Amino acid sequence: MKLNFLSKILMLINLVLLTLQLFLMDTFWDFYHYPFLNLMVPVIALINVIFFVFWIIKFKWPFLLFIFSVLIGFKEWGKLYKFPNNAIPISSGIKVMSFNVRLFNSFEWIDSKSVPQSIESFVNKESPDLVCLQEYSKEFSPKFKNYPHQYIASSKKNGQNGLCILSKYPLLNRGRLDFEDSNNSALYADFFYKKDSIRIYNVHLESLRINLKDTLFTQEHSQKFIERIQSVVEKQELQIDRFDKVEKKNNYPTIICTDLNNNAFSRVYKRLKDNRLDAFMLSGNGLGATYKLAYFPFRIDFIFTDQKFKVINFKTHDIKLSDHKPISALLEWK
């Protein structure tokens, strides 16, 4: 059908947003000059989906623009959404979980006194072989008695905002990566599986520190907001540099559990993932959102694995025991 003047304007806006999304998703080449825009890819994608539905309802040809963009950037769209995998997962393999537990609700963000016990019950029920916890608190943590091997470390003397690796396998060589001028850090530990040595990392990168008081409705506030995002991302890049120095000395295949505090369209994601597998992209379901940023769902928690693993199953657990959702992956050693 022929487009009127208003429809032509809307089509132009839609075309610009679709093109911008493809560039920001790294469809053609690296495009990380504006970290704030990379962070906003899910929002831009939602607007484009709304446009698509609008054109379908109006029965106008610009709905094809969205279809073409999906075909062009099919792989990158997979970072946003995965259709259900109906394959029946095998029961054997290494099951890994990553969960930012937000200090076990020590400041009572959730109106419940039993959050630590509920987290322990959830972990015991899922029974992963290895668990990586971020924002760990020694004071409020349950004992996790089902996990005889535990590695706990914090950059703070009071044990707050620490990291923890829980394991059913003995943890051998262990270490902590302190990040300069930050309360965040990373841990690693090696373990044996089927006579092979494997390394697991628990990585917690610098927080974006976005809250509901942030606004983009004035030039002054929006400029400060964007500058803060830029500053935090630069700090995250330095933390990846620190990680790379340690990882270069490692000869074992790796599993990385991380609260990245950034999304799958950032250079931070690309650098930490490197040539590893993103477990969600291989066996995830739906949006896979793990965190709500100003009420908008984002996927900022990840499990990356060496290519010597086969990702059998991946799950984002829909429970409300923290401001993050836990994720888990079942991995088969090839």
How would you name each of these model-derived features?
Residues M1-F144, K334:
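N-terminal, active-site-proximal structural segment of metallo-dependent hydrolase catalytic domains
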Residues L6-W55, W61-L65, K245-T254, L260-K334:
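Metal-dependent phosphoester-hydrolase catalytic domains
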Residues L37, K95-V101, V115-F140, A189, ...:
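Active-site beta-strand/loop signature of hydrolases that rely on acidic residues for catalysis
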Residues L71-I90, Q117-S121, L130-N211, K315-D318:
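Structured beta-strand-rich core segments of catalytic domains in phosphoester-bond hydrolases
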Residues V101-S114, R209-V232:
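Acidic/histidine-rich helix-loop elements
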Residues L103-F107, S137-S141, K157-Q160, N183, ...:
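Active-site environment of divalent metal-dependent phosphoester hydrolases
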Residues F107-K113, L177-D178, Y291-A294, H317:
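Short, solvent-exposed loop/turn segments at secondary-structure boundaries
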Residues K143-N146, D214, R267-K270:
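Short amphipathic alpha-helical segments
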